[in-house]
Amino acid sequence: MKKFLATTCLAAGLLGLGSAASAAECGDVTIANMNWQSAEVLASVDKFILTEGYGCDAELVVGDTVPTITSMIEKGEPDIAPEGWVDLLPDVVNRGLQEGKLVGAAVALSDGAVQGWWVPKYIVDANPDIKTIDDVLKHKELFPDPEDPSKGAIFNGPQGWGGTVVTTQLYKAYGAEAAGFTLVDTGSAAGLDGSIAKAYERKQGWVGYYWAPTALLGKYEMVKLEHGVPGDMAEWKRCNTVADCPDPKKNDWPKDKVQTLVTKTFADRAGPAMEYLNTRAWTNDTVNKLMAWMTDNQASGEEGAKHFLEENEDLWTKWVSPEVAEKVKAAL
């Protein structure tokens, strides 16, 4: 019996040492908690998995794209920016990578952040010939202007948004006015969302600007229209994104790269935790649905993370080893 107890205690001690070694290897880690829903829930997913699966002492800290990434380069903190919109400040990110201050981990949003013109899925189901912007412009009767049903309507975002400028320029480039469409200023984010919700609930036609990932696209099934032309980045910068450019051309809307960024100092000491950060990625569809659940349930990032981990085991267990997966599942 004494021998059994001694063996048991030794095994427990070795397990404890292994756990302590893992925690010591990972150590304290700070994770930027950005101030929008998709980034907030991803930060909470990372915190839970790093804490419960890898024994890290993980902490969320307030963050935003520009100050967080700048601080990571200049001060070496926070350790992780889970949802880094790297295309918003390419020069800063490239400097951090070239100077050895930053390490690029997984592309967090595997299909990229998406902007463009969307229509309800029920419109496409009923009219399978509608695939592109030009296809929509042949069917103004399917997208009536609320103020003048003899015309079609394209719903734009509020003034001040980059997407609003681009939509205005694409409206010109595709000859939408000549096709009988008006460009509707929705006035605010709430106005834009409300126009989609109203159309969807009445099963009416709607076409206009939106983006992913968003909770609204998790609630309402929408289809992004193809632009019918290849992307031309030089032309995009010259005119499609410039409000007073007089001669915009048809163009494809580029996707934004959303990547997890890690400080070099943390990457060097993270051990197995870095393997997770190099692997963890999800799609717009997954995030849209999760954000819709969070919005409907007024859930926090932490609550959203636990819901995701409970409901999407087939996905997140691919990001970690079987041993880590068991630890995470036991903590839920």
Q: In which residue ranges do the predicted regions lie?
A:
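An extracytoplasmic/periplasmic, membrane-proximal ligand-sensing/linker region
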Residues: 38, 164-165, 169-179, 189-203, ...
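A conserved helix-loop-strand patch within extracytoplasmic ligand-binding domains
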Residues: 101-156
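A bilobed periplasmic-binding-protein/Venus flytrap-type ligand-binding module shared by bacterial periplasmic
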Residues: 114-125, 257-269, 292-293
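Short, well-ordered beta-strand elements
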Residues: 24-38, 57-61, 151-155, 277
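Short, polar/charged alpha-helical segment
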Residues: 38-56, 169-172
